[in-house]
């Protein structure tokens, strides 16, 4: 069930679902696995907010176990495409594609709440069918793995060799460890007044 908020104004009361109300404050929330549905929603919201005000930052809050690499790359590319800076904030868990999107925020504007967890690993995949089909899928997974590792290396400043080694298996980090790694820039416990 999606919570409803009531807003009163001189023209009476108006009911909003919580996500629509957050969108008015330029807050986008990824609180589920990355799927085609969630990615399409987030891409649409980012494009809407850019059209609404291309000079005002957007805040992307992430609490996601990850999900579809292709759909996540659609969100990633849109984050890089839109003019406003994207602040990313981990609330709870940013794992797999969730961590990749957390790291994709504007430099200096990637954050985590104090007790969140961040996890990176290599893309998961499976294939079945004829040997040639399996080989095609394996080649695609290796291509995507290299692409994600290169982006992580570029955004964190870590050598590609370390990224390859650390993403070979699940690699969990606390927010302070994620700062040292270069995935985020700061950790906060309380939001400054008048800040989203």
UniProtKB/Swiss-Prot annotation:
From its record, what is one biological process in GO terms? Answer: protein quality control for misfolded or incompletely synthesized proteins
Which SUPFAM superfamilies does this one have? ClpP/crotonase
Q: Where in the cell is it found?
A: Cytoplasm
Pfam families the record matches: CLP_protease (PF00574)
Instruction: Give the catalysed reaction(s), semicolon-separated.
Output: Hydrolysis of proteins to small peptides in the presence of ATP and magnesium. alpha-casein is the usual test substrate. In the absence of ATP, only oligopeptides shorter than five residues are hydrolyzed (such as succinyl-Leu-Tyr-|-NHMec, and Leu-Tyr-Leu-|-Tyr-Trp, in which cleavage of the -Tyr-|-Leu- and -Tyr-|-Trp bonds also occurs)
Keywords from the named record = Cytoplasm, Hydrolase, Protease, Serine protease
Q: Name one GO molecular function term.
A: ATP-dependent peptidase activity
Could you name the active-site residues?
96 (nucleophile), 121
| S-S bonds | none
Q: Hydrolase as a keyword? A: yes
Complex formation:
Fourteen ClpP subunits assemble into 2 heptameric rings which stack back to back to give a disk-like structure with a central cavity, resembling the structure of eukaryotic proteasomes.
The family line of this record is: Belongs to the peptidase S14 family.
Q: What is this protein called?
A: ATP-dependent Clp protease proteolytic subunit 1
Organism of derivation: Prochlorococcus marinus (strain NATL2A)
């Amino acid at each position: 069930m999606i919570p409803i908020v009531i807003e009163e104004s001189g023209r009476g009361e108006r009911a909003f679902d919580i996500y629509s109300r957050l969108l008015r404050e330029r807050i986008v929330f990824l609180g589920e696995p990355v799927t085609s549905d969630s990615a399409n929603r987030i891409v649409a919201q980012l494009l809407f907010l850019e059209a609404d005000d291309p000079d005002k930052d957007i805040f992307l809050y992430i609490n996601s176990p990850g999900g579809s690499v292709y759909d996540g790359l659609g969100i990633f590319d849109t984050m890089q495409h839109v003019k406003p800076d994207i602040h990313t904030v981990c609330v709870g868990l940013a794992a797999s594609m969730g961590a990749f999107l957390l790291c994709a925020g504007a430099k200096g504007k990637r954050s985590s709440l104090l007790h969140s967890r961040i996890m990176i690993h290599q893309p998961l995949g499976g294939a079945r069918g004829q040997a040639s089909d399996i080989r095609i899928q394996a080649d695609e997974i290796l291509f995507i793995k290299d692409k994600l590792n290169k982006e992580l290396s570029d955004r964190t400043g870590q050598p590609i060799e370390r990224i390859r080694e650390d993403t070979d298996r699940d690699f969990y980090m606390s927010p302070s460890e994620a700062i040292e790694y270069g995935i985020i820039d700061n950790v906060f416990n309380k939001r400054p007044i008048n800040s989203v």
